Amino acid sequence: MNAFFEGVQCSLINFNNFAKNYYTFLLKKFCLDGIFMNVEEMERKLKPKGEVSIIGCGRLGVRVAFDLLEVHRGGVEKVYVFDNAKIEENDIVHRRLGGKVGEYKVDFIKRFFGNRVEAFRENITKDNLHLIKGDVAVICIAGGDTIPTTKAIINYCKERGIKTIGTNGVFGIEEKIKVCDAKYAKGPAKFLNLDEEGHIVVGTEKFIRDFEPITPYTLDEIAKRMVIECLRILWSKYYKS
């Protein structure tokens, strides 16, 4: 009799151990499956969304384009690039990225990124503002008096709900890059004389009269900050729950 009960007790212990192990296995399996399903679902949702116009594809604009279009698991779906200039020998960053001398800067960006880019061999002026489209316009125009054109772009975009990001000085040897609303800018952007908030500017706050150079590492950092601000706008519109 004792042997019988000992056998039953041993069987129960073995069954309990088996049940415990099987329960642990099922728990892990279903938990892991649930996690994997959630990750896959989130990955499907993190598709590129929104459209951005990059106005000017010189040394700064091309950096913005490449940084923005390299973003994955989200980011921008379509980019419109505007510039009528061709790559020259001194356009080091374009050549370093694979551009060819004599090639239109916008065509180079289009060639690199394909259908995600629509290229316009035109400079944006007061006469063709209607070409600007999307959720955000990043203004990277340079050379001469850019204030009138920049202000026209800002006003046009504001009327249509397009957010704008621009520069506030690109000169400087070792300057901290600052981001602020143009209404409160202390650098070149203050000459926009904007009465209302909404136009974001990024830069060193240095003027050409400061007689400091434009360095590649400064442009890298300005482009980085511009892309961050652009992504924040897109995230707030398309991803924020």
From Swiss-Prot:
Pfam families: ThiF. InterPro entries: ThiF_NAD_FAD-bd, Ubiquitin-activating_enz, UCP006529_dinclt. The lineage of its organism: Archaea, Methanobacteriati, Methanobacteriota, Methanomada group, Methanococci. It comes from the Archaea. Signal peptide: none annotated. GO terms for molecular function: ubiquitin-like modifier activating enzyme activity. It comes from Methanocaldococcus jannaschii (strain ATCC 43067 / DSM 2661 / JAL-1 / JCM 10045 / NBRC 100440) (Methanococcus jannaschii). This is Uncharacterized protein MJ0693.
